[in-house]
A protein has these predicted regions:
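Compositionally biased, low-complexity intrinsically disordered regions
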Residues: 14, 20, 36-37
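Intrinsic-disorder-associated, low-complexity terminal segments enriched in Asp/Asn/His/Tyr and depleted
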Residues: 11, 19-21, 53
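Charged/polar low-complexity intrinsically disordered segments
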Residues: 3-6, 10, 40
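Intrinsically disordered/low-complexity terminal segments and short unstructured peptides
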Residues: 4-6, 160, 291
Length: 362
């Protein structure tokens, strides 16, 4: 099944107005449209997560097939004014959750409260540090011809979109930084390799797939391809000619994404969004080894020609309807979000079972 390939200029001419029945955010640059942090419902003296004791990097964790990292955002001013308290302490690769009084008395004791272990724990890390920890290893895998993905998962208002997309300048998230790093490497290898990038951007809204680059309002069908697996044949795929063009495509897609205000989040993503980048590298005829500058790619023994796919997924946040108080259209969205996240949990569990050589269907 073929995919529809367009240039960005063709895409801009044929783009139709977004579905008026879907909530939207105003158009603007991708790196300037989201707040630094997303608000969350706060009750007086509510216990929320805050980071202390930053973990030491664990490079080996990123060498496995699946790496699970947790990032805890700090309390926001609104939460502090409401009397929220920190109940989470980060220690190396462990997250401890306990009573605030015990936290204050015992500090970062690893035996405090309930403990959860992860491959990586991120607390007060900057956006740049998060990218170095998660984004750069993804780029290194993709540059060697391996497919790589990042999923941002968590409850509504926990900061997923901030981590993935971010804001302006130093607050840029993983998606824009991965795109920049990709073009940095392509430019550095331009004398020896020809690099092509094809981009697509889609969302799953109310269990329906929609194209975010050419939003028509009608759902797209998911098909099973004999070699590609599950795919969306009608999804727009754009061959990108430069980093600025890619940034503009991301801005167009983010503008079309379903977003609305809820009691739990002033700008809540009401859909799961997937950015896909197909990266193809081919050695130029008669070229010799060598790059024009150093970077994250410098020590890689990458193949001369290869193709890989990068998928960057910003999942909608799980919601407790009794807390967020959603109704009407927002309630239907919340039901669809929670249902799809439960299905994703089943898929992950089945994959984990398969890795332990148990029979499970995915």
């Amino acid at each position: 099944m073929g995919e529809k390939t367009r240039t960005a200029s063709q895409d801009a001419r044929s783009r139709q107005p977004p579905d008026p029945n879907s909530p939207r955010v105003p158009h603007g640059r991708l790196d300037a449209r989201l707040p630094r942090q997303q608000p969350e419902v706060v009750c007086p003296r509510r216990r929320l997560a805050v980071a202390s004791n930053r973990r030491s990097p664990n490079d080996a964790a990123m060498d496995s097939k699946v790496t699970v990292a947790v990032r805890c955002r700090p309390l926001m001013p609104r939460e502090e004014r409401a009397g929220a308290e920190a109940v989470v302490v980060l220690e190396d690769r462990r997250v401890a959750v306990g009573d605030p009084v015990e936290l204050a008395a015992r500090g970062s004791s690893p035996i405090l409260g309930r403990n959860f272990a992860f491959d990586l724990v991120l607390g007060g890390d900057s956006q740049a540090e998060v990218h170095e920890t998660l984004g750069v290893p993804l780029l290194r895998h993709a540059w060697r011809g391996l497919n790589a993905s990042i999923f941002a998962y968590g409850q509504t208002g926990s900061g997923k979109t901030y981590s993935m997309t971010g804001g302006d300048g130093e607050s840029r998230g993983i998606i824009p930084r991965v795109c920049e790093g990709l073009w940095d490497a392509a430019d550095a290898h331009s004398q020896t390799h020809e690099t092509t990038v094809e981009a697509s951007y889609m969302e799953v809204y109310n269990e329906r797939v929609r194209d975010l680059l050419v939003p028509t309002g009608r759902p797209l069908k998911v098909r099973e391809h004999p070699t590609k697996g599950a795919c969306v044949p009608e999804l727009t795929v754009v061959r990108v000619r430069g980093r600025n063009e890619l940034a503009e495509l991301l801005a167009v897609g983010s503008d079309a994404r379903a977003t609305a205000a809820t009691r739990g989040n002033a700008r809540s993503s009401r859909s799961h969004a997937v950015v896909s980048l197909v990266v193809s590298r081919r050695r130029r005829s008669g070229s010799s080894e060598g790059i024009t500058e150093e970077g994250w790619w410098s020590d890689l023994d990458a193949p001369g020609s290869c193709t890989s796919t990068i998928r960057l997924v910003d999942l909608a946040g799980s919601e407790r309807v009794a807390v967020t108080g959603t109704d009407g259209a927002r309630l239907q969205e919340a039901k669809a979000i929670n249902k799809s996240l439960a299905a994703l949990c089943d898929v992950v569990s089945a994959l984990a079972a398969n890795s332990r050589k148990k029979k499970a269907f995915v």
